[in-house]
Amino acid sequence: MEKRKVTIRHFLEAKGSRKLAMVTAYDYPTARLVDEAGVDGILVGDSLGMVVLGYENTLRVTLRDMVAHVAAVARARPRALVVADMPFMTYETGPRDALRAAAKLVRAGAEAVKPEGGVEIVDVVEKLTKTGVPVMGHIGLNPQRVLTLGGFRMVGKDEEARRKVLEDAKALQEAGAFALVVEFVPASLAKEVTEAVKIPTICIGAGPHCDGQILVLHDIIGLSEKPPSFAKRYADVASIIREAVAKYVAEVREGKFPTPEHYRP
């Protein structure tokens, strides 16, 4: 029997009872594979700028980029919930611009969107959720603010920063977010956030106390050149690709490929 489609309700009901597993995907074949592996959610992340397009950060990723990759993932018709990152400067300018951007992502196949920020984007989250667009929040480290942060640094190490993260979490919940990504904060703070809100929290680099975890696919399978310290590599796909292509190159140069079973006389 076919498994049921994962929905927002699935995420909400998992709070405190079942760990949620999410991963990124950016195209049709990887979306199909990670879905077959049983993930609860697929994030079409603006991290594609770094792991697919070769940028130093996520800031150069455009809405057009995101729409194309969301559409590719959606064509796999995954059981998992498809969440799309809202790229830099598509929502910071206000609710109206955010709604236009979210509409394009939803039309492409996204089932929820994820802007970064806390109290400062409450008006955006309220507008989106009241208009029928599910929102997953993102607190702690916001990669789109890498320039002002001076790099990808842990957030919430001092008391003032901890209070800000907690304030952001509660504000986003009140604004209508159905879940929160909590990125690169101390595990004790992630635990405090998880206990303070009624919606599920999804950790990345924030310890084991959230309601779920998310990692970038390329970090998991060994395709990232410089994975973050909090990522775990479960396979070395890079070596498999290099070995397979090297064998192909050698056989072509030695005249061993193609053989009769690969062509018609």
From Swiss-Prot:
Residues given in the record as 3-methyl-2-oxobutanoate binding sites: 46-47, 85, 114
The enzyme's main class, written as a single word, is: transferase
Q: Does the record's keyword annotation contain Lipid biosynthesis?
A: no
Q: Which family does it belong to?
A: Belongs to the PanB family.
* Official protein name in the record: 3-methyl-2-oxobutanoate hydroxymethyltransferase
Under the cellular component aspect of Gene Ontology, which terms does the record hold?
A: cytoplasm
Binding sites annotated in the UniProt record for Mg(2+): 46, 85, 116
Which cellular compartments is it found in? Cytoplasm
This entry's Enzyme Commission designation comes to 2.1.2.11
HAMAP family named among the record's database cross-references? PanB (MF_00156)
As its record notes, the protein acts as a catalyst of:
3-methyl-2-oxobutanoate + (6R)-5,10-methylene-5,6,7,8-tetrahydrofolate + H2O = 2-dehydropantoate + (6S)-5,6,7,8-tetrahydrofolate
Record: active site: 183 (proton acceptor)
S-S bonds: none
Pfam families listed in its UniProt record: Pantoate_transf
Q: Summarize the subunit comment.
A: Homodecamer; pentamer of dimers.
**Keyword Cytoplasm set for record:** yes
* Pathway(s) it belongs to: Cofactor biosynthesis; coenzyme A biosynthesis
Extract the PANTHER family matched here.
3-METHYL-2-OXOBUTANOATE HYDROXYMETHYLTRANSFERASE
Quote the cofactor binding remark.
Answer: Binds 1 Mg(2+) ion per subunit.
Its biological purpose is as follows: Catalyzes the reversible reaction in which hydroxymethyl group from 5,10-methylenetetrahydrofolate is transferred onto alpha-ketoisovalerate to form ketopantoate.
BP GO terms, sorted:
coenzyme A biosynthetic process; pantothenate biosynthetic process
Question: Which cofactors go with this protein?
Answer: Mg(2+)
